[in-house]
Curated annotation (Swiss-Prot):
It comes from the Bacteria. The keyword Cytoplasm does not apply. PROSITE patterns: GH10_2. Keywords: Carbohydrate metabolism, Glycosidase, Hydrolase, Polysaccharide degradation, Secreted, Signal, Xylan degradation. Residues 29-352 form the GH10 domain. InterPro entries: GH10 (IPR044846), GH10_dom (IPR001000), Glycoside_hydrolase_SF (IPR017853). This is Beta-1,4-xylanase. The gene is xynA. GO terms for biological process: xylan catabolic process. GO terms for cellular component: extracellular region.
Length: 352
């Protein structure tokens, strides 16, 4: 009897060992789920890319993303460097890649205080507005039917609690009129494109209310605006997912779409932190993963209001955070590591 029990126990242990080994091997070969498929019933999944890196990221882009944003190639200094001179080549490469692979394209951006040549601001207010109208006609017209959404105006709001619009030539010379006209002219050129106001730190209550006020004024005047873009450049300390939810709820009161347009989560607690990690610390990757998890729980909760989430990059081997705010500092803000493998943050947002 004892021998029989012992034999059964040994057999069970063998079976258990075999099963665990099988499961381990199965897990090794487990298919990595496609982000765009996981979220196909919620919102588009996008990435900011360059014409120089789309083929470097080709496999990741085709599998996981269904929307692309040109990181710099549609900004004024690149696409319209001189009066009456347009260079659509770099942006066209991205748009063509997207079209061939069934992806949408977000246009970024028509009015911004950075990366705009100085000649744009020469002359009178009327001359500047006429120059902008011509720019919008050419750029939006060139991509009509290919770009489904535009960040028409980018970062117009001041970070100073006592100021509304930022101090920049567009607004110092033209005031809020330039914002209104930009949306009106973009809509005239492509009535089917969705038009967004886009800004950073919109999770902050003060800046949130500024954005609410701006968009409400535009809507009250009948200006065509369809959405607000929350950029979403986070650190491990700020903002909180709850702040994101508060902003989504507030903007939803305006009856507009909300998109997270430039999402990334730095592994630093402070934007100017002195550390420079050559290898990301595990505890920081854990914190990053938790923040992504909580953020996406909120984004899914507001399905129908949140219509798109775009990451500002594809994988950790290239991020704008290498250059700003601390030049040369390594960072690891995205869902895929430098070898293009999914990080813990990736698995946290696909498990639901």
């Amino acid at each position: 009897m004892i021998n029989q029990r012992f034999s059964i126990l040994v057999l069970l242990l063998i079976l258990l060992t075999f099963s665990l080994g099988f499961l381990k091997e199965e897990a090794k070969g487990m298919e990595i789920p496609s982000l765009k498929e996981v979220y196909k019933d919620y919102f588009t999944i996008g990435a900011a890319v360059s014409h120089l890196n789309i083929y470097h990221y080709e496999n990741l882009l085709k599998k996981h993303f269904n929307s692309l944003t040109p990181e710099n190639q549609m900004k004024w200094e690149v696409i319209h460097p001189k009066p009456y001179v347009y260079d659509f080549g770099p942006a066209d490469e991205i748009v063509d890649f997207a079209m061939k692979n069934g992806m949408k394209v977000r246009g970024h951006t028509l009015v911004w205080h950075n990366q705009t040549p100085g000649w744009v601001y020469a002359g009178t207010k009327d001359e500047i507005l006429a120059r902008l109208k011509e720019h919008i006609k050419e750029v939006v017209g060139h991509y009509k039917g290919k770009v489904y959404a535009w960040d028409v105006v980018n970062e117009a709001l001041s970070d100073n609690p006592n100021e509304f619009l930022r101090r920049a030539p567009w607004y110092d010379i033209c005031g809020e009129e330039v914002i209104e006209k930009a949306f009106i002219w973009a809509h005239e050129v492509d009535p089917d494109a969705k038009l967004f106001y886009n800004d950073y730190n919109l999770e902050d209550p003060i800046k949130r209310e500024k954005a609410y006020k701006l968009v409400k004024k535009l809507k009250d005047k009948g200006v065509p605006i369809h959405g607000i873009g929350i950029q979403g450049h986070w650190t491990l300390a700020w903002p909180t997912p709850k702040m994101l939810e508060d902003s989504i709820k507030r903007f939803a009161e305006l009856g507009v779409e909300v998109q997270v347009t430039e999402f990334d989560i730095s592994i630093y607690y402070d934007r100017n932190e002195n550390n420079n990690f050559k290898v990301p610390p595990e505890d920081r990757l854990e914190r990053q993963a938790q923040l992504y998890k909580e953020a996406f729980e909120i984004l899914r909760k507001y399905k129908g209001i949140v219509t798109g989430v775009t990451f500002w990059g594809v994988a950790d081997d290239y991020t704008w955070l290498y250059f700003w705010p601390v030049r040369g500092r390594e960072d690891y803000p995205l869902l895929f590591d430098k070898n293009h493998n999914p990080k813990k943050a990736f698995w946290e947002i696909v498990k639901f």
